[in-house]
């Protein structure tokens, strides 16, 4: 049967149709090969995390999925600046950077800044020169305790929906006209300059009338 609202398949096989049958006999071997490649990569990047670089927390696009959180491509320059990490330095310590992404809300920026700070606090940074340990690098005792992280780096947990409290609608809320209020607010914003100009002209005309009593009589 077809999937979704698609056409029901009704193929009429002919013209040596056995040639066009797609087989899937290599699935078990692919699984073994992927596992071997993961092990090979983990050994190559040791003691770095086997799953790769740290990714930001972003929301899925479209109104259908925007309540879900997932891993993004890389951190923005604003997020790195808020955490006090340079973009070039971030790449060397396992943090993904995306120069194209822009922060569109304060909440997402603060969430990722906090994520970077948490990662930085847990990170064991091996010194370039063991004899001269620079600021920010871990000591030799801490480096001996380092182990490779096998799972995802700082796994993302979806937020729990807020608890909604039900109550009766008040009389004032029933009388409130949302559309009229929004329309009045838009009108006031559009006419603020014109009304200020009219008020200024009216004040100037009153001052002129007070200064010349003959003009006021006329």
Swiss-Prot record:
Keywords: Cytoplasm, Ribonucleoprotein, Ribosomal protein. GO terms for biological process: cytoplasmic translation. It comes from the Eukaryota. One of its GO terms (cellular component) is cytosolic large ribosomal subunit. GO terms for molecular function: RNA binding; structural constituent of ribosome. Pfam families: Ribosomal_L13e. The keyword Cell membrane does not apply. Belongs to the eukaryotic ribosomal protein eL13 family. Component of the ribosome, a large ribonucleoprotein complex responsible for the synthesis of proteins in the cell. The small ribosomal subunit (SSU) binds messenger RNAs (mRNAs) and translates the encoded message by selecting cognate aminoacyl-transfer RNA (tRNA) molecules. The large subunit (LSU) contains the ribosomal catalytic site termed the peptidyl transferase center (PTC), which catalyzes the formation of peptide bonds, thereby polymerizing the amino acids delivered by tRNAs into a polypeptide chain. This is Large ribosomal subunit protein eL13. It comes from Drosophila melanogaster. The gene is RpL13.
